[in-house]
């Protein structure tokens, strides 16, 4: 059976770079407070670009790297919790802006695990013969979903996009395995509310609070548990040793979470890719951004085995094993 391999990649961030010190202008916080609790030093915040704009720019780089035209793409999946609109989907907007007229396109919402979910879908559709060249994108403008008066949450997030091109292959490389899971019973630990139920047939009017509401302690316990389990599970399932893994790319949420998992597993810290100090938590974009940056910097090369592991709202989590 044919598999799916990565042949192109690209990342994009808005131009507006926000250092921790700038947050002190309107928040009771400090650079030291943010760094010591999260590891984050700066993030990019969009001023006039939508999620689709970020996705398009990352996709152009990925297509150029792959040596493909937009018309050669037959599938576009965008993982996002901050779409441009309820409808049309961000993926359809991206399809139009790229001129990918032969692609069918849709969004998925699996929060910070979204890129892993999209990877599984893209791989499955290529393996089934339903697609040949797929554009898989993680893109977010989380800045529009933040309560900028809540220092506990607004300092954590940033905007950005990462994209990869998958194509069918018979080579011994590509996406080897993807495991994803969900637990909706704990979904209230991380919520961005939707529109309130307002109608002329309902007494009173509700006020929308469509910004991120997070139980930090519960998310920490959840994240550390499922990250550890997901890494162990994929190693055991694929019968591969940690020594054979060149890098582990976790969702970039908080350095404390990553450091906790490193200690629990006893895996060398240098195997874990971290760049959240420069981007903050970009949700579904964090894993592809970290992947692209690692390849661009020469830290990953053809033939390397990597594990991607994510967790997020839903609750959702998952991991993928990839041979570049």
From Swiss-Prot:
GO terms for biological process: fatty acid biosynthetic process. Its EC number is 2.3.1.180. Residues 252-256 are annotated as: ACP-binding. The keyword Acyltransferase applies. Keywords: Acyltransferase, Cytoplasm, Fatty acid biosynthesis, Fatty acid metabolism, Lipid biosynthesis, Lipid metabolism, Multifunctional enzyme, Transferase. Pathway: Lipid metabolism; fatty acid biosynthesis. Its main location: cytoplasm. Homodimer. This is Beta-ketoacyl-[acyl-carrier-protein] synthase III.
């Amino acid at each position: 059976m044919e598999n799916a391999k990565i042949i192109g990649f690209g990342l994009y961030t808005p131009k507006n770079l926000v250092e921790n010190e700038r947050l002190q202008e309107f928040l009771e916080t400090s650079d030291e407070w943010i760094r010591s609790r999260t590891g984050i030093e700066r993030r990019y915040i969009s001023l006039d670009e939508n999620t689709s704009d970020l996705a398009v720019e990352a996709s152009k780089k990925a297509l150029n790297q792959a040596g493909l035209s937009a018309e050669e793409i037959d599938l576009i999946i965008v993982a996002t919790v901050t779409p441009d609109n309820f409808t049309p989907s961000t993926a359809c907007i991206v399809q139009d802006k790229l001129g990918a007229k032969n692609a069918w396109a849709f969004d998925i919402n699996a929060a910070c695990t979204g890129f892993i979910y999209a990877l599984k879908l893209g791989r499955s559709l290529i393996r089934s013969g339903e697609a040949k060249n797929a554009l898989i994108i993680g893109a977010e403008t989380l800045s529009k979903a933040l309560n900028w008066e809540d220092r506990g949450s607004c300092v954590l997030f940033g905007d950005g996009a990462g994209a990869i091109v998958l194509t069918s292959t018979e080579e011994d490389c590509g996406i080897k395995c993807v495991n994803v899971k969900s637990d909706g019973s704990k979904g209230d630990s991380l919520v961005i509310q939707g529109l309130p139920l307002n109608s002329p047939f309902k007494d009173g009017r509700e006020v929308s609070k469509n910004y991120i509401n997070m139980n930090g302690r519960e998310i920490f316990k959840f994240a550390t548990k499922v990250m550890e389990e997901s890494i162990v599970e994929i190693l055991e399932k694929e019968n591969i040793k940690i020594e054979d893994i060149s890098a582990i790319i976790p969702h970039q949420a908080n350095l404390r979470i990553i450091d906790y998992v490193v200690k629990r597993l006893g895996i060398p810290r240098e195997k874990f890719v971290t760049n959240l100090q420069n981007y903050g938590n970009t949700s579904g974009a964090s894993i592809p951004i970290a992947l692209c940056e690692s390849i661009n910097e020469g830290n990953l090369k053809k033939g390397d085995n990597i594990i991607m592991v994510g967790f997020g709202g839903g609750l959702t989590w998952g991991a993928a094993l990839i041979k570049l």
